[in-house]
């Protein structure tokens, strides 16, 4: 998901999306530990998405 798509969402939607991505990150880390994850690069992609969501939440709260 691109940052421009995140800017248009409300804080409640962003928080729900953030929670979903954190659960996904947890699941991916568990799969990595049990050697079930075929593509470890997914973890960094999800971490990047979480950072983008946090940035969008901060920008929305500050009124930017």
UniProtKB/Swiss-Prot annotation:
SUPFAM superfamilies assigned to the protein according to its UniProt record, in alphabetical order: Ribosomal protein L29 (L29p) (SSF46561)
GO biological process entries: translation
UniProt cross-references to InterPro entries, sorted A to Z: Ribosomal_uL29 (IPR001854), Ribosomal_uL29_CS (IPR018254), Ribosomal_uL29_sf (IPR036049)
PROSITE patterns assigned to the protein according to its UniProt record, in alphabetical order: RIBOSOMAL_L29 (PS00579)
GO terms for cellular component: ribonucleoprotein complex; ribosome
UniProt GO molecular function: structural constituent of ribosome
Keyword entries, A-Z: Ribonucleoprotein, Ribosomal protein
Family that this chain belongs to: Belongs to the universal ribosomal protein uL29 family.
Protein name: Large ribosomal subunit protein uL29
Gene: rpmC
């Amino acid at each position: 998901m691109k940052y421009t798509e995140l800017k248009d969402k409300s804080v409640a939607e962003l928080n729900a999306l953030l929670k979903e991505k954190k659960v996904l990150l947890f699941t991916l880390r568990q799969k990595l530990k049990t050697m079930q994850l075929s593509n470890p690069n997914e973890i960094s992609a999800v971490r990047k998405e979480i950072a983008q969501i946090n940035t969008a939440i901060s920008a929305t709260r500050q009124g930017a």
